[in-house]
A protein has these predicted regions:
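Typically disulfide-stabilized, N-glycosylated extracellular/lumenal ectodomains of secreted
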Residues: 2-16, 20-252
Length: 252
């Protein structure tokens, strides 16, 4: 990650064309959530079980850099106001969560530039490296995002690529930046023009936490996710969603 840069304070929703606003994925209950910070560009110190707000910005890769240095999307020096799209999430700290960005079609996010950056905080301005989401040829639908905390303060965010062994040899898939990617023409709304594809290519982000909370309790979900990788949690949740949708469709 680039050297830590102090971000210019700014309310995140004002910095983007906000087309995506998602509810909390794991639903930290009000009575169990001790974190009262809901702004992704503000600093928070959390315990296990608290809610934690972060954002994901979608734009071209170069839009996240200024003078060759990657900045937080909260930083007003980045030219994101009229081009980027934003998703906001509030998962529960140290719970395994799968978040879905409910884009209207594959082209909805690729038209923003095809890359995404996760971010949170102001003092440390934690941000992930830009990761490829999609273009007119291929779209990645499964991601793993790791939060690294120290005494309850977010220090780092990074994407963990799973490699391409699971899609090797499949006609509708390719390997892009060490991740399996489906042909965008197979997606609903493929190529940004409401294509004929039938696959829901909305990005799914699996979360994991590492480090320590503000009480110095160890966050273990990254270890749990790494051990469960062989079972493909993203595939498990996707299959469950498809199964439930199929069962409900039988009632109509």
């Amino acid at each position: 990650m680039a050297a830590t840069t102090t971000a210019t304070p700014r309310r995140a929703p004002a910095a983007f064309v906000v087309l995506l606003l998602l509810a909390a994925a794991s639903g930290a209950s009000a009575r169990g959530d001790g974190n009262g910070v809901y702004e992704p560009c503000a600093d928070a110190t959390v315990s296990r079980g608290d809610g934690f707000t972060f954002g994901v910005a979608f734009a071209g890769r170069d839009a996240f850099f200024s003078g060759g240095v990657q900045l937080s999307p909260c930083d007003g020096r980045l030219p994101l106001q009229n081009t980027a799209k934003l998703a906001l999430f509030r998962p529960t700290v140290d719970e395994i969560s799968l978040l879905t960005v409910n884009a209207s079609g594959a082209g909805d996010l690729t038209s923003a530039g095809g890359y995404m950056v996760a971010f949170a905080g102001r003092k440390f301005a934690a941000r992930s490296p830009p990761v490829f989401v999609g273009n007119s040829s291929y779209t990645v639908t499964g991601f793993t995002l790791v939060f690294e905390f120290h005494k309850g303060t977010l220090q780092n965010l990074f994407w963990k690529a799973d490699g391409c062994s699971s899609c090797s040899g499949q006609a509708n898939f390719g390997c892009v930046e060490n991740s399996c990617a489906i042909k965008t023409s197979s997606c609903r709304g493929g190529n940004g023009g409401g294509g004929a594809g039938q696959v829901d290519c909305s990005p799914g982000i699996q979360l994991a936490f590492s480090g320590t909370d503000k009480h110095e309790a160890v966050l273990n979900s990254w270890y749990e996710v790494s051990k469960l990788k062989q079972y493909s949690l993203f595939g498990l949740f996707s299959n469950l969603k498809d199964s439930l949708a199929g069962q409900f469709s039988n009632f109509f």
